[in-house]
């Protein structure tokens, strides 16, 4: 019998316990042996819970029990999760986690510990929630050189942007609806709306693709706070919708660029039709071409099911999984991983007339003039040209309020 421990009994942790109880027979059959939860670590009082006898307060209880073979970490963050996970791996216990912040920051180190101590460190749920992407990328796409990954990886912001389009809601009203439905944090939704959640996810995928650690702090990241209903309407005029896109590109020379930013997505692009809390990730391989992974990105039981699938893999394969799921340590780079490739851009400026915007940005067209300024569509520019244009706007008393890159017509 395989004994496991769960660290943290919040939404995902309790979901893992529920999945293991409800689908015990199927999980045990796939693992090749019965799977049983022996401990649940959580400082809160669960004396009234049916599994109250499983709760412990100290990680040492788990570390000192040789029967525990797999540890599920669902605490979140890094303050407690990182040292606990490190100790578990060093003791030869496999770890399965949904903790994107920990994987994005310490992934290379923890993968190295798993290999060194003949165990597994698995994190399928850290990027797609219940939508598989980690396992398909390191197994099914192993014969491909991946050049690009882009997609919608945050269900909260996608739900908000969908409602800003469908219901003509402002950012604040869309956030309020998301909070009322439990899609956004009520106390502090900044990880979602400012793009940090998506940044951690694309950092993990970038590390997998590149074979070395890519850090979130090197990825330019912008959220959706600056999006207005007027921007949504202007996007419609351009045949587009606005989506928060996380992306990475790897050049033939080994160069890496990555980012998280709201973008204009043409309606002919398959990412444009991904709505509500659904996620979609497009992966471009040299042999397979384009493949899309689509599904709900979060939720108690979908996420828990991905974690439990990792538990099964850890029990069946152990450290062998790291023959393909592994990346090397690396130091953070100086500067940001920006993309020098020119693209079309939507720019909203305040404090200057449309004619001035046209003179500064060059070839393009005015999309909207309702502001104290205008919205201008730039046919072709790169990051350097946009930065220079922003300086010129400021020099004549204006300011740049929003910049949105337009994705290609088809992806």
Question: Where are the model-predicted features located?
Answer:
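Catalytic, metal-anchored helix/loop core of enzyme active sites in primary metabolism
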Residues: 146-150, 158-161, 165, 183-190, ...
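Flexible, glycine/charged-enriched surface loops at secondary-structure junctions
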Residues: 34, 188, 192, 213-221, ...
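A conserved regulatory-domain signal marking ACT and ACT-like small-molecule sensing domains
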Residues: 311-411
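Rossmann-like NAD(P)H-binding beta-loop-alpha module
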Residues: 68, 115-197, 204
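A short hydrophobic/small-residue beta-strand
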Residues: 94-96
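Rossmann-fold NAD(P)-binding glycine/threonine-rich loop
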Residues: 81-87, 91, 100-138
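Substrate-binding/catalytic subdomain of NAD(P)-dependent oxidoreductase enzymes
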Residues: 173-273, 278-280
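N-terminal glycine-/serine-/threonine-rich beta1-alpha1-beta2 phosphate-ribose binding loop
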Residues: 1-91
């Amino acid at each position: 019998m395989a004994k496991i421990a769960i660290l943290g009994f919040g939404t995902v942790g309790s979901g893992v316990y529920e999945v293991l109880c409800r689908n015990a027979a199927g999980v045990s059959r796939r693992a090749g042996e019965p799977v049983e939860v022996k401990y649940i670590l959580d400082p809160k009082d669960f004396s009234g819970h049916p599994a109250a006898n499983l709760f412990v307060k100290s990680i040492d209880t788990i570390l000192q029990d040789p029967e525990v073979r797999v540890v599920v970490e669902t605490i979140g963050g890094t303050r407690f999760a990182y040292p606990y996970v490190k100790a578990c791996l060093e003791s030869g216990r496999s770890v399965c986690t949904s903790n994107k912040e920990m994987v994005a920051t310490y992934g290379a180190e923890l993968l190295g510990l798993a290999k060194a101590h003949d165990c597994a460190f698995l994190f399928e749920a850290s990027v797609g929630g219940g939508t598989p992407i980690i396992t398909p990328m390191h197994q099914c796409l192993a014969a491909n050189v991946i050049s690009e990954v882009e997609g919608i990886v945050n269900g909260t912001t996608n739900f908000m942007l969908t409602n800003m389009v469908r219901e003509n809601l402002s950012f604040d009203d869309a956030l309020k609806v998301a909070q009322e439905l439990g899609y956004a944090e009520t106390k502090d939704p900044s990880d979602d709306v400012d793009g940090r959640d998506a940044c951690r996810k694309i950092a993990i995928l970038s590390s997998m693709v590149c074979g070395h650690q890519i850090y979130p702090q090197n990825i330019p990241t912008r959220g959706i706070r600056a999006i207005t209903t007027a921007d949504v309407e202007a996007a419609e005029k351009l045949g587009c919708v606005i989506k928060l896109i996380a992306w990475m590109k790897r050049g033939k020379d080994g160069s890496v660029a990555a980012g998280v930013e709201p973008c204009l997505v043409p309606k002919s692009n398959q990412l444009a039709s991904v709505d509500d809390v659904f996620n979609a990730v497009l992966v471009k391989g040299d042999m397979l071409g384009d493949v899309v992974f689509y599904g709900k990105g979060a939720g108690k039981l979908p996420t828990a099911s991905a974690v439990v699938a990792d538990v099964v893999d850890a029990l069946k394969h152990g450290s062998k999984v790291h023959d393909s799921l592994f990346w090397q340590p690396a130091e953070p780079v100086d500067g940001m991983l920006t993309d020098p490739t020119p693209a079309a851009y939507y720019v909203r400026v305040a404090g200057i007339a449309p004619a001035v915007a046209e003179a500064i940005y060059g070839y393009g067209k005015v999309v909207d003039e309702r502001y104290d300024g205008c919205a201008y569509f730039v046919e072709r520019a790169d990051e350097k040209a946009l930065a220079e244009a922003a300086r010129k706007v400021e020099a004549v008393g204006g300011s740049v309020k929003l910049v949105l890159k337009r994705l290609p017509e088809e992806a």
